[in-house]
Amino acid sequence: LLDEIACWRSLPKEKRILFASLLKGKKEFEGFLSMVSAEYIHKGIPELIKELYAGKICQHADLDMLINQYPCGLTYALALIDTTDYRSITPGWVLYNYPEVEFIIKLLRHTTCKESCDYCHTQLDVLHNLKTFFGYEHFRTYEGEPLQERAAQAAVKGKSLLAIFPTGGGKSLTFQLPALMAGHSVHGLTVVISPLQSLMKDQVDNLADKGITDVVTINGMLDPITRSLSIQRVQDGEASLLYISPEMLRSKTIEKILMARHLVRFVIDEAHCFSSWGQDFRVDYLYIGKFIQKYQQKKKCKTPIPVSCFTATAKQKVIQDICDYFKQTLNLNLELFASTASRTNLHYSVIHVENDNDK
């Protein structure tokens, strides 16, 4: 208790007044606020929040609604936003008692406003963050179409999508960038489902080469010590991106660590594996929707968790299967971003031969 009192008194006076005013009349905080002789204000709370958190939250967020409906959750959300370490995560007991905290943080820091305030114009702008995280000035285009940028921006806006980009066409960056942005803005975790363990390792290593270390993979190739360390990094909030295989979603350990984190998106790589019409059909892919359903129910999510599906090529029937699956299981509508299947750096032709000698 003495530590809590000391921590309270170390806060700037304006924030003590703000927090006390939000918590005034809440039975669970009455004793503490009385003990520290808290000061209150009755008007101007939204204006005080905007002043104290300028540059940290969207200036057009509906603060009146949050103050009226979720004063306790808003207080915890603002306290978490105050932390300088983006890897700090909300304690489990807070999420248990105030599950709205994750929703509030998303509303304040990861929901773009139509007016494009200073915060959204920089912190939620994909081109600005492309330079920040990867050092690139521009996104890749496909026959003059900025599909990569559009898909990344759609993800930042919270949309679910299906992107059909050619192999080597930059699909990884398209989901890695929004994931890193969400990790820094809302302490969120993006789960990437991939069927190939070697591909997971390659992507983690490539990001590490760029100085991006808040990425973890958990798969069957890891020795027990490395696996334990990877799990601990996810639990401690050190990961913004987690690569796993679809089979791992059935693991109780994986379920436990994901329940303790704020999941902001599921990314499904090689999404053609959903379709029985595809040559690489994986039955475990069909469990992804059920897992997301279960997670949303247990966490009492106020908004659906969006998904991003990626594949290099897909027939129309496969595309329809993917879209139908997420509509039926999660009631999600996938926005389609598709490039042509042709590769300008590859050419092939068919030459008819009559016999082995001609070959």
Put a short name on every predicted segment.
Residues 1-121:
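N-terminal accessory nucleic-acid engagement/regulatory domains that precede
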Residues 116-164:
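Conserved pre-motif I regulatory segment
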Residues 180, 222-265, 273-279:
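Conserved helix/coil segment N-terminal to the catalytic DExD/H
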Residues 157-163, 188-190, 238-240, 303-306:
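Pre-Walker A (Motif I) flank of P-loop NTPase domains
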Residues 191, 197-244, 336:
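Conserved nucleic-acid-binding Ia/Ib motif block in the N-terminal RecA-like helicase ATPase lobe
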Residues 259-260, 264-265, 272-338:
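Post-DEXD/H (motif II) to motif III coupling segment of the RecA-like Helicase ATP-binding lobe
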